[in-house]
C-alpha cells in the first residue's frame, strides 16, 4: 500500500483581504520557515488577481498553494474543495483542515467522513455563528474550536457548551516611529477592507458634522462591498468632501501609511482581535476604536472608544488625545507598544496553531 504524505489543509477566501488573512499569512510564512507541510486552498471569493500570492507560491517549498475559481453562491466552490481532496487522496493524507470563514463549515462533515480532523478558528466576535443554526450544526463536526479574543471564546463556549481555546494574534516586531513634534491631528488613517461591517461611513458623518476639521481621512483596504463603497462615494460627493477623503485600496506595505498618520481609527461594528490596533501600538501611533467587544480588551481606556453611531464621540476621543500633556502622551504610546511585544508574538501564535493542527 502506498504511504501517503501527511499534510495540513488551510482554506482561505483570498490570500490578501482583511485581518484574518493577514494573520494566516504570518502563519504560512512561519510554517515555511519551520518546514511544516501545509497546503493552502485559495478560494478566490472576490476573484482577486494577487501579486503577493504569486510571489509566495514561487518562493515557498514546504507550503503549497492551490487556486480555486470562486463560485460560493452556486455551491460550486465546495465541490471544488472536496474534488481537490479526493483527487489527492492516493498520495496525501490531510490530517487536519483549518477553517476560519463560517460558510466553509459546509465541508466540515465531509472532511470528517474522509478521516480529516477539522479545526474552526473564529476571527471576529462569533456573531455569524450565533445567528445561524446551519453554522452551529456544522460546527458540531469540528474537532476543535478556536478564537482569537476572550469575548469570542466566551460567546462560543456559551453557544456550544464546548471548550474553546484562545490563540491570540501575532504581530511582527517593527521599529517604533518617533513621536511627532507637532501632535496636531490632520491625517486620520482607517485601515480596513471597505465593507459595511467595518463602518467607514461613520468617519464621513464625522467630517460632515465637524467642518472645522481641516485634515484628511485616508481609507486603506480592499473593496469587499461595492454597494457600500458606492454609498460612501455618493455621500462624499453630495456633501462636497472630496478634498478631505482618500481611498488607497490595498497597500502591500502599510508601514509608510502608519508613519504619516497622526491618528488611527477603527470604527467596526464588531471585531475579534483587531490587527489594526496591534499595528498602531507597535508603530507608536495613537488609536481610537468603536466601543465593541474585542476592541475593549485591547483599548482599555473608555475615553479612547466611541459609539458605532456617534461621530460626536469620535470628536471627544480626538480632543482627549490632543489635550494629553507630552509625558502622558509618550507614556500612552510606550505602554501600548509594550503590550504588543509582551503578548502578541508571531512565534507563539504559530506554534499554538501547529500544536493543535498536528495532532
What are these regions (language model features)?
Residues 19, 326-358:
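A charged, aromatic-enriched C-terminal amphipathic alpha-helix characteristic of glycosyltransferases
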Residues 286-289:
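Short hydrophobic beta-strand element within catalytic cores of glycosyltransferases
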Residues 21-29, 190, 195-209, 227-230, ...:
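A conserved mid-protein helix/loop that constitutes part of the nucleotide-sugar donor-binding site
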Residues 301-312, 320-326:
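Conserved acidic donor-binding segment of nucleotide-sugar-dependent glycosyltransferases
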Residues 250, 269:
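Aromatic "clamp/platform" in nucleotide-sugar-dependent glycosyltransferases that forms part
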Residues 154-158, 168-186, 196:
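Acidic anion/phosphate-binding donor-loop and adjacent secondary structure
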Residues 10-18, 22-74, 157, 225-228:
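N-terminal strand-loop element at the rim of the active site
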Residues 98-105, 122:
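Short His-centered aromatic/hydrophobic patch
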Amino acid at each position: 500500500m502506498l504511504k501517503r504524505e501527511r499534510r495540513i489543509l488551510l482554506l482561505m477566501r483570498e490570500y490578501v483581504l482583511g485581518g484574518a488573512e493577514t494573520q494566516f499569512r504570518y502563519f504560512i510564512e512561519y510554517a515555511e520557515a519551520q518546514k511544516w507541510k501545509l497546503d493552502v486552498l485559495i478560494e478566490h471569493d472576490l476573484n482577486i488577481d494577487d501579486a503577493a500570492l504569486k510571489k509566495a507560491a514561487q518562493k515557498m517549498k514546504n507550503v503549497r498553494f492551490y487556486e480555486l475559481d470562486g463560485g460560493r453562491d452556486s455551491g460550486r466552490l465546495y465541490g471544488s474543495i472536496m474534488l481537490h481532496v479526493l483527487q489527492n487522496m492516493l498520495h496525501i493524507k490531510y490530517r487536519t483542515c483549518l477553517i476560519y470563514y463560517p460558510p466553509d463549515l459546509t465541508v466540515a462533515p465531509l472532511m470528517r467522513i474522509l478521516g480529516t480532523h477539522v479545526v474552526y478558528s473564529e476571527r471576529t466576535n462569533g456573531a455569524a455563528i450565533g445567528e445561524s443554526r446551519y453554522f452551529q450544526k456544522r460546527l458540531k463536526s469540528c474537532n476543535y474550536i478556536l478564537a482569537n479574543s476572550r469575548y469570542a471564546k466566551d460567546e462560543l463556549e456559551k453557544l456550544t457548551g464546548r471548550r474553546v481555546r484562545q490563540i491570540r494574534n501575532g504581530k511582527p516586531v517593527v521599529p517604533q516611529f518617533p513621536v511627532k513634534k507637532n501632535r496636531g491631528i490632520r491625517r486620520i488613517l482607517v485601515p480596513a477592507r471597505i465593507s459595511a461591517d467595518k463602518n467607514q461611513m461613520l468617519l464621513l458623518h464625522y467630517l460632515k458634522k465637524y467642518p472645522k476639521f481641516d485634515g484628511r481621512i485616508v481609507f486603506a483596504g480592499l473593496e469587499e462591498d461595492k454597494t457600500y463603497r458606492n454609498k460612501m462615494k455618493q455621500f462624499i460627493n453630495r456633501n462636497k468632501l472630496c478634498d478631505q477623503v482618500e481611498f488607497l485600496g490595498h497597500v502591500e506595505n502599510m508601514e509608510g501609511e502608519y508613519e504619516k498618520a497622526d491618528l488611527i481609527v477603527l470604527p467596526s461594528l464588531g471585531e475579534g482581535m483587531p490587527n489594526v490596533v496591534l499595528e498602531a501600538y507597535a508603530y507608536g501611533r495613537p488609536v481610537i476604536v468603536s466601543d465593541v467587544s474585542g476592541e475593549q480588551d485591547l483599548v482599555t481606556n473608555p475615553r479612547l472608544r466611541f459609539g458605532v453611531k456617534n461621530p460626536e464621540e469620535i470628536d471627544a476621543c480626538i480632543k482627549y488625545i490632543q489635550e494629553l500633556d507630552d509625558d502622558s502622551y509618550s507614556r500612552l504610546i510606550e505602554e501600548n507598544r509594550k503590550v504588543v511585544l509582551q503578548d502578541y508574538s508571531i512565534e507563539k501564535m504559530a506554534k499554538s496553531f501547529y500544536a493543535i493542527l498536528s495532532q
